[in-house]
Protein backbone atom coordinates (compact mmCIF):
# COMPACT_ATOMS: atom_id res chain seq x y z
CA UNK A 1 0.00 0.00 0.00
CA UNK A 2 1.21 3.51 -0.80
CA UNK A 3 1.01 6.59 1.42
CA UNK A 4 0.41 10.16 0.21
CA UNK A 5 3.19 12.61 1.21
CA UNK A 6 3.74 16.35 0.70
CA UNK A 7 7.04 17.87 -0.45
CA UNK A 8 8.07 21.29 0.89
CA UNK A 9 10.83 23.63 -0.28
CA UNK A 10 13.78 23.69 2.14
CA UNK A 11 14.49 27.39 1.52
CA UNK A 12 11.05 29.02 1.81
CA UNK A 13 8.95 26.20 3.34
CA UNK A 14 6.29 26.36 0.61
CA UNK A 15 4.45 23.05 0.11
CA UNK A 16 4.46 22.71 -3.68
CA UNK A 17 4.17 19.00 -4.53
CA UNK A 18 2.37 15.83 -3.45
CA UNK A 19 3.48 12.29 -4.26
CA UNK A 20 3.16 8.74 -2.94
CA UNK A 21 5.67 6.36 -1.39
CA UNK A 22 5.82 2.77 -0.13
CA UNK A 23 4.62 2.16 3.44
CA UNK A 24 7.73 0.05 4.17
CA UNK A 25 10.04 3.07 3.76
CA UNK A 26 8.60 5.06 6.69
CA UNK A 27 12.00 5.48 8.37
CA UNK A 28 13.62 7.72 5.76
CA UNK A 29 12.38 11.07 4.44
CA UNK A 30 11.96 11.55 0.71
CA UNK A 31 13.97 14.35 -0.98
CA UNK A 32 13.81 15.59 -4.56
CA UNK A 33 15.21 18.49 -6.58
CA UNK A 34 12.10 20.34 -7.85
CA UNK A 35 11.17 23.80 -9.14
CA UNK A 36 9.77 26.17 -6.49
CA UNK A 37 7.45 28.82 -7.93
CA UNK A 38 7.89 31.04 -4.83
CA UNK A 39 11.72 31.03 -5.00
CA UNK A 40 11.58 30.92 -8.84
CA UNK A 41 14.40 28.35 -9.05
CA UNK A 42 15.16 24.65 -8.55
CA UNK A 43 15.61 23.76 -4.86
CA UNK A 44 15.66 20.65 -2.69
CA UNK A 45 12.17 19.63 -1.58
CA UNK A 46 11.84 17.41 1.50
CA UNK A 47 8.96 15.28 2.73
CA UNK A 48 6.88 16.93 5.47
CA UNK A 49 4.87 15.35 8.28
Curated annotation (Swiss-Prot):
UniProt KW Transmembrane keyword: no
One term of GO molecular function: structural constituent of ribosome
Keywords associated with the record: Ribonucleoprotein, Ribosomal protein
UniProt GO cellular component terms: cytoplasm; ribonucleoprotein complex; ribosome
Highest taxon in the source lineage: Bacteria
Signal peptide: none
Biological process annotations from GO: translation
Family statement drawn from the similarity comment of this UniProt entry: Belongs to the bacterial ribosomal protein bL33 family.
Protein name: Large ribosomal subunit protein bL33A
Organism: Geobacillus thermodenitrificans (strain NG80-2)
Gene from which this protein is expressed: rpmG1
Amino acid sequence: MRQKVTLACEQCGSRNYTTTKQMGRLGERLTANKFCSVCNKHTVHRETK
